[in-house]
Amino acid sequence: REWVILDTLHRESLHTLLEEFGCKGVSEERVEHLNRMWHRLRPWSDSVEGLERLKKRFILATLSNGNVALLVNMAKFSSLPWDTILGAEVSRSFKPMPHTYLTTASMLGLAPEECMMVAAHNSDLQVASGLGFRTSFVCRPEEYGPKQRTDLEAEDDYDLIADDFI
C-alpha cells in the first residue's frame, strides 16, 4: 500500500469499528468529527509546564507518527510549545522504521547523538538508542488505559528515567 497519513489510518479504523459494532447511519460529518478527536487530545497534566522549561534550553520537536495537521492542531488545542513538528509525514515512514528517526534528526541539522528521544514507549526508545540517540523514558502507567500491561517501567538503561516532566 502507498504511504498515507495517520488521520487516514484512524478514519479507516473508525469505519471498521463502526461496522464491527453495528453502528449504522453515522453521517460522514459525524465520522469526521469523531476522527478529529485525535486533534483535540489533552496532554498529561505536567506536559506543558515541563516542555516550557525544556524549551528555554533545548529545541523541542515532535518525532511522532501523527501527521503535521494533527500535531499542529493538538499543539494549538493544548498549548504544546513545540519549536517544530516532525516525524512520519515529513519522512513518509512510520516509527519504528529507522528512516523516521534519522530524518527527524537530519531536518534539525543534528546527528542522532545530539538528540534525545523522550517517550513513554520502550519500543520507541530501543529503536532510537540503537540509532545513536540519547533516550529518556517517562513513565505513563495509564497511557493505554487503566488496565495497561506494558511500558510500566523502563526496560533498558536509558540516559534518563522520570515519572513526569517536572
Question: Where do the model's predicted regions map?
Answer:
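A metal-dependent, Asp-based hydrolase signature
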Residues: 1-32
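Asp-based, Mg2+/Mn2+-dependent phosphohydrolase catalytic module
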Residues: 48, 52, 63-166
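Surface-exposed cleft-lining segments at the edges of enzyme active sites
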Residues: 32-40
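Solvent-exposed, charged/polar functional surfaces in cytosolic regulatory/catalytic domains
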Residues: 16, 20, 53, 57, ...
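Glycine-centered short loops/turns at secondary-structure junctions
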Residues: 57-58, 132
